[in-house]
């Protein structure tokens, strides 16, 4: 098991780690919000999901309303016809969903998937901005570096409780692997 803490589960310790993680995730997702809004006009669902993530990070309860905001942003992603806007909305959805990360699922594929809840806002924001900039990989690299540099200690602690992201062959899986490695490296230096 890749963890330095006992299995966190649904404990107050886990919630204490998830709150600053949600604030970081909201900041990451916010980087791509304009990509969505330029393409999808007045659809406020991703913006509301990011606000919900910030609310949880600032002390609001993890409740049905927050889960509904995440699902609404997910629907916005599915309804968009623009790939960059879809990824931007997914970043927002995952920012709101950070509050529901299962910290007790920390091994194997389940652990990899839970880590993606944490990494997803930055990764999907990076990919949205990369595609919007005509596939400029430097844009994504800059966003991932900023996300790694700004990741609070709580993100590092949570990721150390979960397996590393596999390298993969798709651009998306490569970005997940890259951000995960950057945060883990920064945490040990």
What do the predicted segments below correspond to?
Residues 2, 150-189:
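Acidic, carboxylate-rich catalytic segments that either coordinate divalent cations
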Residues 2-148:
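Structured binding/interaction patches within domain cores
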């Amino acid at each position: 098991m890749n963890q330095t803490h006992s299995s966190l589960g649904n404990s107050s310790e886990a919630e204490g780690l998830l709150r600053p993680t949600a604030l970081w995730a909201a900041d990451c997702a916010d980087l791509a919000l304009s990509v969505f809004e330029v393409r999808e006009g007045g659809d406020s669902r991703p913006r509301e999901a990011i606000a919900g993530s910030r609310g949880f990070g600032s002390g609001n309860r993890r409740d049905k309303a927050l889960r509904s905001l995440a699902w609404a942003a997910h629907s916005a992603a599915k309804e968009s016809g623009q790939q960059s806007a879809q990824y931007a909305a997914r970043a927002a959805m995952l920012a709101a969903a950070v509050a529901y990360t299962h910290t007790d699922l920390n091994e194997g594929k389940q652990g990899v998937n839970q880590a993606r809840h944490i990494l997803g806002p930055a990764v999907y924001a990076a990919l949205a901005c990369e595609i919007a900039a005509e596939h400029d990989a430097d844009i994504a690299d800059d966003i991932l570096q900023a996300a790694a540099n700004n990741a609070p200690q709580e993100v590092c602690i949570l990721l150390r409780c979960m397996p590393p992201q596999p390298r993969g062959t798709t651009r998306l899986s490569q970005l997940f692997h890259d951000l995960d490695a950057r945060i883990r490296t920064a945490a040990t230096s």
